[in-house]
């Protein structure tokens, strides 16, 4: 998994940067690894908090609050969906007004507050319903947590989502601001920073699902969440203490404003007549993006009403809320061109979300003994993270060099082909999950036997392998194909696919629960048919894959693509191709 700045364009040199006093930065005292290293702590802590909560929350909701499996899954996926969606808000606020430093600092403080509230919510006994004994649980007589008891939990979760979204969308961009890309030495350091950035995420995630989940299950939720809160508080303090060491950049405005403005003006002028020739559109002669006939309705945003009055026309052109330029209109068209691929990426994250909900609950109905040690249900997700790390390494050392020789392309296979491979892995994961769940249920119902929870490893492995391809492919696709002046929204588009994936999971669970009269997704999985739900995801995944292929084969890649490859010794190789393959070629997928 490779992480890229959420908010920077094609080139950001140190000449645009300033220190905390507003003066040109001294490279020997600001930025570089000195500043970036302090910033990494914020992302490390965010991962510890979010992964420690999301990967084990469903067991608390079902086991302690006596909430149904379907409702518990919906709570978790809505939380994760909101967190990623609020990443768009965090990116917008940073780009439009606050800047990345202020946004990360505020978000870290908000996240710390949210985890403190969660610690309180899970520690106070009055925030939980009465303990349910085995007899009541067997006969579905457990008292479910009421609205009053859930209120503080919801406030805590969505406070964390608000803060986590702000960190997620800005911390990598703020880290990259510490390097001057016009300096070859610092540009190389920035690429190395992204490697270390991902390493921090991996370390934080593994610590959360192994150590914190164990503490939550065996010592107490309060202790587990308390450690997360303390970690976030320390990270916020360290971030603030390093203020004098950072390089800052002024907000340049959000590209979402441009998209909204073009859409608004096109609608406002919808009754206007098209000019006799596109050259009469505002800014046609100075456009940096060639005019196209695609989505011609948007061209109306660039129609000037005062062609006969040069002074009035000049006034209009200075106010972007009166008339847009051809460049702005064409940039919005390029973004709209990405929507079909964006939409067909959503279901991958819907499948991924099952690893944080029903797969964790499956583990609670299986034999988790490892000798005398009982592995916490949420800790099995460590296999997901380890698989992602494994395949990321294999991609760099084996897969990319091999496919380069086979396809004669600098990056091995195209970004859309990477996404396609990830989608196939996700379908395979759900098919395997369905088979394993059927075997688990039959053993429990017919033989009163629990099969080993390590049978869940294959589905974690397949989803992890899929993420290694799909994550990189999606992020690479949006970064490459977004307009040059709208690169800052690349991560925003990517985060929105993750967000929508979790929300679609919530919607799907609700629909299935209603259509099947709650027979597929019961709290007692031995009386449920979770395997049917997994097979449904396989079918939906197959249909989505076919639609993806249709759109991918029609997609035309942008010209003049720069490929950046980080080798094992952290050296940087750049390769430029005049034109990517213009379509998604099935024959190139290994």
UniProtKB/Swiss-Prot annotation:
- GO molecular function, a single term: symporter activity
- What GO terms fall under cellular component here? cytosol; membrane
Biological process (GO) annotations?
A: nitrate assimilation
CDD domains, alphabetized? MFS_NPF6
Keywords, alphabetical: Membrane, Nitrate assimilation, Symport, Transmembrane, Transmembrane helix, Transport
Kindly summarize what the UniProt induction comment says about this protein's expression: Up-regulated in the shoots by nitrate, but down-regulated in the roots.
The annotated region (Disordered) lies at: 1-24
Which InterPro entries does the protein's record reference? MFS_trans_sf, POT_fam
Q: In which tissues is it expressed?
A: Expressed in leaves, flowers and siliques. Detected in leaves.
Compartment(s) where it occurs, according to its Swiss-Prot or TrEMBL record: Membrane
Name the PANTHER family for this protein: OLIGOPEPTIDE TRANSPORTER-RELATED (PTHR11654)
Q: What does this protein do?
A: Low-affinity nitrate transporter.
So what family is this one in?
A: Belongs to the major facilitator superfamily. Proton-dependent oligopeptide transporter (POT/PTR) (TC 2.A.17) family.
- Name of protein: Protein NRT1/ PTR FAMILY 6.4
Q: What organism, scientifically named, is this protein from?
A: Arabidopsis thaliana (Mouse-ear cress)
| Species classification | Eukaryota, Viridiplantae, Streptophyta, Embryophyta, Tracheophyta
| Name of encoding gene | NPF6.4
